[in-house]
């Protein structure tokens, strides 16, 4: 009875849907268009629900008939199967499906099973938390906590996964808010992360953030308002809230909860131990942390050639790959016959803003012992010669020079000469300042003359427009025009006088300097 009522209701709903679609195609009143569209959507949903209910009822009847046929004797089995087939075909016709051959149905079922298994595997890996590598733009390798969003293949066919980083420390690592919904319009040109494809072999176990180990003064990574995690230091802890001060001077101090703070990616370099065992443990931890170690000057010189390039295990290793393609064998020297150098070339830091010629000159000066001693050696004999000189005998010409120049009798001729040189330098500097001031005055006066000429041009145009119209306005314009012309004449005279002063100064310079 329930099956018949559902079938009748389904028939009624389909008839109503056809009427609504006919009304929409007929072009009804625009005010009723929205209501009809909503009614069509509701009827479609109602038909889908009724079909699913009818399908479940018929499945239950089919299962009950199968259970009943199992208890029947064996000779009557073909008749039971045929009746079941008839019911199944009637059921498929009722829901509007076409019957398929048995082989096709088996193939479809096996294909659907395989696809379901693949989907289950993808669903199993999706959402998994791991520790994934991240190669920064400056070439360093860091491991960050991440979440798997799907499985993909790398370019070389190797199995990989796409991950999104949970604690982004750069804008390029921050997940795009529209990527997971499939609404991002920028695709590869988006400035945010759409996930990074990582090989399965490069993944590491997820490391849970131990916030309990943080104390006042501990370094940490803190989440800013822009969603990026920046390096910071804890300054205060009070009732579950952490006050942090960011290392960047551009970011202000913030009060955050525990879920907005994590320990740094690698431990602080300041926390070290005096024991040798602790040092070895720290070295092992540094090797396992995924960061390249910086060797000191002493250790770099004693590094064995077989260990050279070992840091490339934590990077893409493009240098070693290029050398291997060119035929280089690890541990041997460079060159065709492996007779070249094995150790790396030491970098030489040159001063900024200096050319190679200047750097070579500086190195040669250092080797020669410097230039200052050479200059001092030159000055010494001159100073001794001046100090050891004897006072020349006075004559009548010295007496006349003293009286005419106003020089005291005890002053030496060399001292008067130096005083005259100082006075000449002061006069020369004063003349340079006065010349600069004259040049500035000439430029300002020329600019004022141009402004006054433009003003006279505007007044002449206004006067030409008002000819024969208003005598009062014309008289005012004529007065302003005559005043502007007088000011222009005065400015031109001032410019001529300044130019004369400039020429006089230039002539004086030519006459006094040889």
Curated annotation (Swiss-Prot):
Residues 115-124, 272-287 have a biased composition (Acidic residues). A zinc finger (C3H1-type) spans 171-197. It comes from the Eukaryota. It is found in: Nucleus. Residues 315-373 form the G-patch domain. The keyword Amino-acid biosynthesis does not apply. SUPFAM superfamilies: Tudor/PWWP/MBT. Keywords: DNA-binding, Metal-binding, Nucleus, Repressor, Transcription, Transcription regulation, Zinc, Zinc-finger. One of its GO terms (cellular component) is nucleus. Residues 365-383 have a biased composition (Basic residues). This is Zinc finger CCCH-type with G patch domain-containing protein. The lineage of its organism: Eukaryota, Metazoa, Chordata, Craniata, Vertebrata. The gene is zgpat.
């Amino acid at each position: 009875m329930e099956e018949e009522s559902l079938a009748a209701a389904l028939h009624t709903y389909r008839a109503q849907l056809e009427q609504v679609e006919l009304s929409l195609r007929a072009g009804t009143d625009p005010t009723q268009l929205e209501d009809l569209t909503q009614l069509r959507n509701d009827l479609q949903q109602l038909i889908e629900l009724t079909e699913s209910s009818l399908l479940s009822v018929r499945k239950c009847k089919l299962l009950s008939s199968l259970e009943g046929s199992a208890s029947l004797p064996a000779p009557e089995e073909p008749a039971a199967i045929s009746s079941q087939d008839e019911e199944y075909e009637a059921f498929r016709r009722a829901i509007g499906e076409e019957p398929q051959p048995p082989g096709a149905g088996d193939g479809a079922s096996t294909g659907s099973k395989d696809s379901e298994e693949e989907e289950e595997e993808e669903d199993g890996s999706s959402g998994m938390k791991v520790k994934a590598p991240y190669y920064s733009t400056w070439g360093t390798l860091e491991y960050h906590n991440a979440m798997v969003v799907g499985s993909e293949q790398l370019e070389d066919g190797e199995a990989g996964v796409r991950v999104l980083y949970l604690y982004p420390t750069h804008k390029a690592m921050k997940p795009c808010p529209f990527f997971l919904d499939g609404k991002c319009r920028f695709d590869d040109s988006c400035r945010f992360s759409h996930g990074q494809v990582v090989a399965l072999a490069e993944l590491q176990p997820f490391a849970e953030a131990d916030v309990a180990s943080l104390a006042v003064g501990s370094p940490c990574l803190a989440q800013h308002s822009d969603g990026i995690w920046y390096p910071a230091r804890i300054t205060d802890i009070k009732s579950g809230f952490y006050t942090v001060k960011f290392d960047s001077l551009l970011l202000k101090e913030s009060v955050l909860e525990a879920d907005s703070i994590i320990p740094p990616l690698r431990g602080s370099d300041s926390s070290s131990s005096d024991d040798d065992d602790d040092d070895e443990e720290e070295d092992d931890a540094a090797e396992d942390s995924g960061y390249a170690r910086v060797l000191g000057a002493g250790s770099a010189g004693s590094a064995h050639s077989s260990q050279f390039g070992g840091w490339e295990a934590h990077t893409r290793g493009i240098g070693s790959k290029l050398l291997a393609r060119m035929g280089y064998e690890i541990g041997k020297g460079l060159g065709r016959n492996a007779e070249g150098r094995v150790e790396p070339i030491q970098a030489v830091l040159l001063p900024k803003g200096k050319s190679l010629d200047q750097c070579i000159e500086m190195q040669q000066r250092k080797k020669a012992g410097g230039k200052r001693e050479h200059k001092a050696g030159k000055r010494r004999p001159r100073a001794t010669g001046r100090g050891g000189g004897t006072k020349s005998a006075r004559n009548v010409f010295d007496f006349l020079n003293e009286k005419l120049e106003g020089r005291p009798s005890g002053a030496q001729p060399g001292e008067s000469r130096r005083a005259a040189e100082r006075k000449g330098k002061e006069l020369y500097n004063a003349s340079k300042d006065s010349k600069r001031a004259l040049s500035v005055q000439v430029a300002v006066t020329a600019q004022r003359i141009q402004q006054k000429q433009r003003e006279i041009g505007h007044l002449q145009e206004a006067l030409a427009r008002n000819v024969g119209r208003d005598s009062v306005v014309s008289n005012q314009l004529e007065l302003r025009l005559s005043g502007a012309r007088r000011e222009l004449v005065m400015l031109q005279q001032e410019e001529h006088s300044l130019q004369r002063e400039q020429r006089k100064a230039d002539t004086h310079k030519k006459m006094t300097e040889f």
